[in-house]
Amino acid sequence: MNSKQCVVIAIAGASASGKSLIAKTIYEELCRDLGTDQIGVIAEDAYYRDQGHLSMDERVLTNYDHPKALDHELLCQHLQALKDGNPVDIPVYSYTEHTRTDEKVNLTPKKVIILEGILLLTDPALRDQMDASVFMDTPLDICFMRRLSRDVAERGRTMESVMSQYTETVRPMFLQFIEPSKQYADIIVPRGGKNRIATDILKARIQHLLAK
């Protein structure tokens, strides 16, 4: 599989803006069209840096909403490897331990790679790997309520810790890094991941790129 046979689509935006939902929808619908072995999804947060050398007290202070928290260089290397026809081993990150685990997820080359993450559009080298990009333009207050429910239910967080993180890092980093990166998106999607028209437009773009 050469680079022209691998289409990379990026879905960016605030935490809990609907990125995973639209990525899941596109993945499932493209699987029906192309086959389940031809589509792959990579979550940017798998590439949070390993912090095994730090104490737990130090790890919990990590600003997950700053670009420096992510190993975008490794993500770029993995995307290029997939385009070159080589499999990659994607890291697995633990939010309870605040570091990478010893596990890896093997991903083989695909016709379509869907990236989803909050800071994808902030990195020029990463943008160069993309064939099309989307920014989920969901109101920040809605994102916060979704994030609060998710982190308490799925990530073992307390309501107080989620609220503190939001005011100290999530909102400031959104305004400093994530929202300005919207200018680099090819498609801006309002109303979250259930925007059917935006989903259809993105699918049509993917099909067009595959037909080249």
Swiss-Prot record:
Keyword Aminoacyl-tRNA synthetase in annotation: no
Q: Could you tell me the keywords of this UniProt record?
A: ATP-binding, Cytoplasm, Kinase, Nucleotide-binding, Transferase
Q: What class of enzyme is it?
A: transferase
The EC number of this protein is 2.7.1.48
Localization annotation: Cytoplasm
On whether Metal-binding is a keyword of this UniProt record, the answer is no
The metabolic or biological pathway listed in the UniProt record of this protein is: Pyrimidine metabolism; CTP biosynthesis via salvage pathway; CTP from cytidine: step 1/3; Pyrimidine metabolism; UMP biosynthesis via salvage pathway; UMP from uridine: step 1/1
- Give me the reactions it catalyses: uridine + ATP = UMP + ADP + H(+); cytidine + ATP = CMP + ADP + H(+)
Q: What is this protein called?
A: Uridine kinase
GN (gene name):
udk
